[in-house]
Every structure is written in C-alpha cells, then in structure tokens.
C-alpha cells in the first residue's frame, strides 16, 4: 500500500520540522511521499523530494490539511494511506508506516488509526491524548470513536467516500466531525499504542482562540452530525462539564461567546448520523452525548 504524509506548518519551527521529516524518511519499506503545506507562511528549507505548497493565508488546521490531501490527487487518491503529522512531532519508530500498511491490509473495515502521543523527555502520554473515556492506560490499544488530528493515518478511501475535514472549523473538533462521518459510513477507528509520535507536552489552551472555537465548533459538530433529539442533550452535557471545570472569567466569557456563535452562524451541511451509528458509538464506549 502506498503511503503519503501531510504536514502543515506556520514556518516557525524549522528545526522541529526537519527532525520530523527525517523521521519520516527513515521509515521502513517503500518511501513515504511527503507534502508540507505552509499555512499562510513560507515553508522552511526541506529535504530534496519533499513537495511544498505555500498558501497566501492561514486556512486553519482543517483547511491546511485539506490542501495537503488534494496535493495527492482528488481525495488523496494517488496514495492508499495518508499520515497527518504535527510539524513539531517526531515518529519514534522506523516501522510506523509498515505497521499502518499491515493494519489496513489486515482489516478491511479499518478506516482511521490514531497514534499514541508521548512526551520525548518523559515518555508520558497525556490523558487527553487517549481518544476514549477510559483513558487511564495509554498502552492499551482499542477501537475508539475519534482520533488525534496531528498523529494519525487515514485510508484515503474514507476521504473519497465521506469527504475531508470541515474547513470552517479552523481549529478544534474537526477530527471528531470526520470520525463521526466515517463511522456512519461503516468504517472503524483504532487507537494504537505501538504507533508513537513524540511530541512535547502542551496545553490546548495555549491557543488564544481555544475557548471560543472549542465552544463554537462543539455546537457545529452537533448541528451537523447528531439526530435532532440528541443535539440539546450533547450540548447540555458539555456545558455542564465546562462549568464544573471552573474556567477563569475571561475563558468562560469566550466560551459562551463561541457557544452563541455556533448557533448564530452556518455550520455547513447537516447529515445526521443514523441511530445504528449512535448505538455503535455507545457500544464502543462513547455515546454521542459526551
């Protein structure tokens, strides 16, 4: 199976980007073709053979990754598998691409693989980087209902069938939107602890727009994908969880601003998942109300 990789960059981490690209080049088996997308910024110097696309403006994470997908033909169809990797990450092992090939070849239902993210210094995997509710053991691989945006592999047939990431989300929850559409189309998602991306431990709230976009996109996610009966339940649960976390006053103000924005602005096409998909998510351990 032919493997490609998409990396988006703001051009501000040239050393980390080079280390990532070197780790991709060291993968066992056939070479992985790489496209680096400069998301509103020039692409730093990259090794020979790495293709680059420079965008005149920042299209956000999903928009930038979608450009990278199309660089491999419509829906990424020039390759069988696409890796999506953060530009400050590093593939910890040289057999990751081969493990992906083997996993997809052995399981026709498998559409997406979420890698384990580990801190390069401590080896720690943050709880939020284990894409399931029972996240206490990051070394346990399992079927899951979503995936990590900057450390994953996607079978391109999934993208050809259900489309790419939602451009308008810009940042936050775009992976879950794609995951739900893939699951509704019959695909499965695996979390694999043996496929590791080393990545420094960070807090998502480091992004200035975090609280607003998390809330807005949560509303869009529900409006786009959930049966009407579940929309208020899902959003009510997440509002309660947000309040229980006792965010700062500015963060809470930004969150409620984003929540209102999610209702007041277009969310894109609405394609509610089937009830059997709701049941599938429930059996996988995460009903779409949390």
Language-model segments: which ranges?
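Glycine-rich, basic loop-to-helix element that forms the pyrophosphate-binding segment
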Residues: 55-74
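Short, acidic, metal-binding catalytic loop of nucleotide-sugar glycosyltransferases
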Residues: 22-31
